[in-house]
UniProtKB/Swiss-Prot annotation:
Origin organism lineage: Bacteria, Bacillati, Actinomycetota, Actinomycetes, Streptosporangiales
Protein role: Oxidase that catalyzes the conversion of cysteine to 3-oxoalanine on target proteins. 3-oxoalanine modification, which is also named formylglycine (fGly), occurs in the maturation of arylsulfatases and some alkaline phosphatases that use the hydrated form of 3-oxoalanine as a catalytic nucleophile.
Family indicated by similarity: Belongs to the sulfatase-modifying factor family.
Gene3D superfamilies: paralog of FGE (formylglycine-generating enzyme)
Residues given in the record as Cu(+) binding sites: C269, C274
Protein's recorded name: Formylglycine-generating enzyme
Native organism: Thermomonospora curvata (strain ATCC 19995 / DSM 43183 / JCM 3096 / KCTC 9072 / NBRC 15933 / NCIMB 10081 / Henssen B9)
Details of cofactor binding: The catalytic copper is required to activate oxygen and catalyze oxidative C-H activation.
A GO term for molecular function: formylglycine-generating oxidase activity
Pathway: Protein modification; sulfatase oxidation
Length: 303
């Protein structure tokens, strides 16, 4: 775990629990065997997992909340230290300097010098008009720093998935099996032709406020689409396939790894390319990586 050079304030249980949802302990069926899944992601097998009770944020951490953390601690994010972060190509203002660094399998990502949480599209951009949008350009390290300061932690992948399911058993999405029940959009994802034209039929072509759309059965917002959310676990495509107490009772993932799990999908997910806005879907990134579609929410043990 990273170490931090800021003071961790003492917080009352009531202060920590504010804005969090209590998830009862018990069992649920984790993972999926969706034919549309990416085999290399290791969504399966479907397995029964038992979890202890926990708390989880109702919303993803917002720009306003992260700004309060930075103001209190002087924290500098990984994107700021590196001097750049990844921005979706259509969101980069004309004339903005860019770097040669590219992701060959995803050329729509542009490395933009000066892009960070407070200037998400690069120099000249601002979060002034989106204080209630999820903070982005935050690495796993940054998310752990915020959570530690807030008296919380990141959720395990199992906790995140149990909470995101909202009490439904093996539903495809946090609200059921239909993407747009009764023609209503329930999440912020890409509509149109990816990656050239987003029609914005769901109301957004970038991030949405953290309280947009209806919540799931547990009262959590935006656990599908909007921004990817960091989890505590190291990534593995097959660690969880082995039947053992470690993988079935309060699982915390492998002991070591090179990347951390992210869940939930983002506003850039589209069925033609990345359908990972399904609850069982998962992917990963290195702990120091950041991008314009990745944020987080926190968890905590019962207080």
């Amino acid at each position: 775990m990273p170490s931090f050079d800021f003071d961790i304030p003492r917080r009352s249980p009531q202060e920590i629990a504010k804005g969090m949802v209590a998830i009862p302990g018990g069992t649920f069926r984790m993972g999926g065997e969706d034919p549309d899944a990416f085999p290399e992601d290791g969504e399966g097998p479907v397995r029964t997992v038992r979890l202890s009770p926990f708390l989880i944020d109702r919303y993803a951490v917002s720009n306003r909340q992260f700004a309060a953390f930075v103001k209190a601690t002087g924290y500098v994010t990984d994107a700021e230290r590196y001097g750049w972060s990844f921005v979706f190509h259509a969101h980069v203002a004309p004339g903005t300097p860019v770097m040669d660094a590219v992701v060959p399998e995803a050329p729509w990502w542009v490395a933009v010098p000066g892009a960070y949480w407070k200037a998400p599209e690069g120099p000249g951009s601002s979060i002034t008009d989106r204080p209630n949008h999820p903070v982005v350009h935050v690495s796993w390290n940054d998310a752990v720093a915020y959570a530690t300061w807030a008296g919380k932690r990141l959720p395990t992948e199992a906790e995140w998935e149990m909470a995101a399911r909202g009490g439904l058993d093996q539903a495809r999405y946090p609200w059921g099996n239909e993407l747009t029940p009764r023609g209503r959009h329930r999440c912020n994802i890409w509509q149109g032709t990816f990656p050239v034209h987003d029609t914005g039929e769901d109301g957004y072509t970038g991030t949405a406020p953290v309280n947009a759309f209806a919540p799931n059965g547990y009262g959590l917002y935006n656990v599908a689409g909007n921004v990817w959310e960091w989890c505590a676990d190291w990534w593995s495509a097959d660690w969880h396939a082995t039947e053992s107490p470690a993988t079935r009772i309060d699982p915390r993932g492998p002991e070591t790894g090179t990347a951390r799990v992210t869940k939930g999908g983002s506003f850039l997910c589209h069925e033609s390319y990345c359908n990972r806005y399904r609850v069982a879907a998962r992917t990963c990134n290195t702990p120091d990586s950041s991008a314009a579609h990745t944020g987080f929410r926190c968890a905590a043990d019962p207080l």
